[in-house]
């Protein structure tokens, strides 16, 4: 099931990203740049290891993990978080915890597109990616 997520995905639509970034504490200047950026996400599956690379002119990140195993992550906005990713009903659910807070990043495939839903408290952002050929 995870194999379906593999590929190179380009951001084509983003809703409420600024509200989400404000909610997790991202500063004004960083939000301005991040809002203008159209990142590419590359998802690779290598046995039981999943690699997610996010590349943009703003910042590039890479995480490597196994489903259900907690790992340390430094986010694009430099938060140091404890993360765990699980597969739940065909969705990749990524939970990040830091300083008594938590946020979820849920990736799901809908009509051939990758939908990323970011949630922190009442802030909900939806980012839509299309697969590159």
Curated annotation (Swiss-Prot):
The modification Phosphoserine is found at residues 23, 83. It is found in: Cytoplasm. Pfam families: Lipocalin. Its main location: cytoplasm. The modification Phosphotyrosine is found at residue 20. It comes from the Eukaryota. GO terms for molecular function: long-chain fatty acid binding. One of its GO terms (biological process) is long-chain fatty acid transport. Gene3D superfamilies: 2.40.128.20. Hexadecanoate binds at residues 127-129. The modification N-acetylvaline is found at residue 2. Octadecanoate binds at residues 127-129. Keywords: Acetylation, Cytoplasm, Lipid-binding, Phosphoprotein, Transport. (9Z)-octadecenoate binds at residues 127-129. Forms a beta-barrel structure that accommodates the hydrophobic ligand in its interior. Belongs to the calycin superfamily. Fatty-acid binding protein (FABP) family. FABPs are thought to play a role in the intracellular transport of long-chain fatty acids and their acyl-CoA esters. This is Fatty acid-binding protein, heart. It comes from Sus scrofa (Pig).
């Amino acid at each position: 099931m995870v194999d379906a997520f593999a590929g190179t995905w380009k951001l084509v639509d983003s809703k409420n990203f600024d509200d989400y970034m404000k909610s997790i504490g991202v500063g004004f200047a960083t939000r301005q740049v991040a809002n203008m950026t159209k990142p590419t996400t590359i998802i690779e599956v290598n046995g039981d290891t999943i690699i997610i690379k996010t590349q943009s002119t703003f910042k590039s990140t890479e995480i490597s993990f196994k489903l259900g195993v907690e790992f340390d992550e430094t986010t694009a906005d430099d938060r140091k978080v404890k993360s765990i990713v699980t597969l739940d009903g065909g969705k990749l659910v990524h939970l990040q915890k830091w300083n008594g807070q938590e946020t979820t990043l849920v990736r799901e495939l809908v009509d051939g597109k990758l939908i990323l839903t970011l949630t922190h408290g009442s802030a909900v952002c939806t980012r839509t990616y299309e697969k590159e050929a």
